Amino acid sequence: MSWHCSSGAAERRAADAETRRLVAKFAPAQEQLVDATRRWLRKRLPTACEVVYEYRSWFVISYSASAQGYEGVLGIRGDGDGVKLYFQQGKGLPDPEKLLRGAAQARWIAVESASTLARPAVASLADEAIARSTVPFEATGRGAIVIRSKSAK
């Protein structure tokens, strides 16, 4: 079984529409911020798969070299309380400005506005996380959007 990300234009449009539906459902006040964060991540990882999960009260978009979300390097979590930028292997990242939150392997930054993403320290953390990825990303192409099954309600 191949876990490579690829999809046609129609599949991509349908998956993007489902992603937007989930964002509107779980983080309606944050739709523009989620869009800005997705664009910011897609600029850094144009060939990454956006692996989208729905949980009880939030959504997650993992940016992965494959259709396996657990291989994701960076991610977005959104809910009614806001948007977070996740660093899956954030524990070992150099963070001189102490931006990363959390105590486990994965760490996160609250994305309060698009200006958060414009901070050089945030860009540096993301770029370092990508550089440390153990799963290589495709050199060319465009990553697919992969919708994973809904969680049990």
Describe the role of every protein-language-model region:
Residues 1-153:
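Charge-dense, helix-prone N-terminal extensions
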